[in-house]
Amino acid sequence: MMPLLHAARMLVLMALGACSAEKHAFDRHLAQLRPDTVTALPDMGWPAGTMLCPLSLYQSALAGSAPLAGRVNAFLKKKQFLGGEDWSLIVVRPLPAGEAGIEQLFFKRADYDVLNDPQRIGRDAEKVPTGFAPQTCVSVEQARVLVTREQRAHRKLIIFGTALT
């Protein structure tokens, strides 16, 4: 009986381990993108009017001039978020108002980095095509991601923004 119970526990632990290693669908989508492309985001079920605000590595707040900066930064401050080795996506739904409409998704650093600082984009990105405008926060309806390469390290860079069609 004990070996059977031990085997059952091991199966449960292995299943839990497999679930925790599972990437979010959004992360899987970004990881599959090829450099030198601008693409729309997949439908993640976010309602119209939802804003997406990526935070890059070690970034703990949005720039003060960014749309929604006050609301998002108050949310991050209340959570005592300090940034770190991972990047995150702040999802701000139009309703409900306040903190209840904000969600923070965390993504482990992988084979790409997310940038949203204009100075870093200008310094590190190999190229930003004409017609693509990097944005600190972007609506799901207009959101596009640019995939480019870092000039010195050749890592993929993901930049959120809008594109002229």
Model feature map: region roles:
Residues 57-89:
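Surface-exposed acidic loop/strand-edge motifs in secreted or periplasmic proteins
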Residues 97-121:
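Long, charged/polar, surface-exposed segments that mediate recognition or autoinhibition
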Residues 1-17:
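Sec-dependent bacterial lipoprotein signal peptides
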Residues 114-165:
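C-terminal partner/receptor-binding element of secreted or periplasmic proteins
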Residues 79-105:
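Mid-length scaffold segments of soluble, non-membrane domains
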Residues 61-62, 97-103, 155, 164-165:
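Short, surface-exposed beta-strand/loop "edge" segments at domain boundaries and coil↔beta transitions
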Residues 19-70:
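N-terminal export/targeting and maturation segments
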